[in-house]
């Protein structure tokens, strides 16, 4: 398994996921704060191939479905993944805040358009 730290927006995101990767003894690919998350995903997929890893988990930044620029970033991430493996992604998870109530359904619909769930 290999982790791709694609949350390049939140200040402590890299440190947090690196901590868990170390605790779990899992390889990780990360970049600098503010880097292109799709580039990190590409690097993670390439690293997984070269290291013989068959599972890659890409952790992306949280985002609101109403922020079009962030949804476009997610679409770019999806295109990069598909170029690496036409059948990917094999699984996609959307984690939502439980307090959103019925708004989470609309959020899932919008996310599904940008990155199939």
Predicted regions and their residues:
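P-loop/Walker A NTP-binding module and the surrounding RecA-like catalytic core of P-loop NTPases
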Residues: 1-117
